[in-house]
Amino acid sequence: GVVYEDPWRAGGHNGLSNSEDPNVPEDPRPRVAELRKVMNDLGLNSVPIVMAGGVWYMRDWADWIEDPDVAPVAFQFGTRPLLTQESPISKEWKTRLLTLEEGDIFLNKFSPTGFYSSAVRNPFLRELKGRSDRQIAFVEEAEGDLHHEFKIGARGRQIFVTASDKALAEKWVSEGYTDGLRTPDSTVIFVSAEKSKEIQKDQSDCMGCLSQCQFSNWAQNEAATTGRRPDPRSYCIQKTLQDIVHGDPVDDQLMFAGHNAFKFKDDPFYSNGFIPTVKELIDRL
């Protein structure tokens, strides 16, 4: 089969391109119909398309099953099996899934892969958003409006920023975000001293789990580097995924989830905190 992963509704990394608006989801059917036409033209008429992302009730997709414009078609469930007795995620994680509200799933671009991913909007993601919000442009030699001196780092390295950005930086420092970390985009973000140490340790502990990592600048090439400065606006994905699956507090880690995860709360199947077995879930579907 050929999997069509809805780039707005699927959980985790979902293939949203830079030409698509993360805030304007599109109907998957025209895209799947276009894919089916291409496959049929290539003689793949009998190969099913697997619809992934946004699938909750099979009744919502009944009109697809016999539709020649998309059929043969199958459906993939990624989020619902998380909330089963056999699922290896922690009890806290399962409990949290039962409380999510619509809008709690956040399509974000903090991933070290450089791609969008869909995850629960928890303190982990809010902290990442805060890093990017506390960000200003700088140059190393004064030019134009960027001529106001500001010092960052333990050695007080001099950079030049605009007057308004200098005022922002001074405000953030007064709030406890004392450490300025440079990004590969000629900007600097402000974080606490504790967070700065954590970021730098995670970067130095990189185990090369990605072929290219924006966070650590590791790359699977002869130079072992992307050639860009490590990006402190991101995070170590291997560390956070290992930590959450091994029982760390879910608010402190990345919680991948599909857009429909908020439906756990109001679906009568999960009333009173009911967690089904895989068999019970399949029977329900």
At which residue positions do the language-model features occur?
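Non-cysteine beta-strand/loop elements that form the S-adenosyl-L-methionine
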Residues: 1-7
